[in-house]
Amino acid sequence: MKNRTSSKQGFTLVEIMIVVAIIGLLAAIAIPNFVRARTQSQKNACINNLRQIDSAVQTWALENKVAASATVSFGNISGYLKDAVVCPAGGTAFSDSYTLNGITNKPTCQKVSSSHILAPDTTT
């Protein structure tokens, strides 16, 4: 008689469960870091947009010899911006992303006002 040895190959249920648990643990560590990095990059991009807007406002005011108390609109500064600026944290247009606060005050972000703030000038 021939001896047949059963040579079943594959992973056991325990091995598969261990691999799934390890993948879950790695995901639990990686996902919050990814979300935090994404939020920080959106904040940095928004603050850069605020700098560009402020620079456009100041340039427009200087070139047109506008009084410091004058109001400014997006139509006034659109020619001074290379591209339309939108808050990366969920804005769809300039008007729902940013507020122009005159010439002497910095523009502000409407989307996440608590963290997307352009710091005042410290040079005097």
Where are these predicted regions, by residue range?
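Conserved catalytic core of two-component sensor histidine kinases
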Residues: 20, 47, 54
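N-terminal leader/signal peptides at the extreme start of proteins
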Residues: 1-11
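Extracellular/periplasmic head regions of type IV pilus-like filament subunits
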Residues: 55-58, 62-124
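Internal alpha-helical transmembrane segments of multi-pass membrane proteins, especially GPCRs
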Residues: 9, 15-18
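Aliphatic-rich helix starts adjacent to a transmembrane/signal segment
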Residues: 35-50
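Alpha-helical hydrophobic helix detector
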Residues: 17-33
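Catalytic phosphate/metal-binding cores of nucleic-acid and nucleotide-processing enzymes, i.e., regions
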Residues: 12, 51, 55
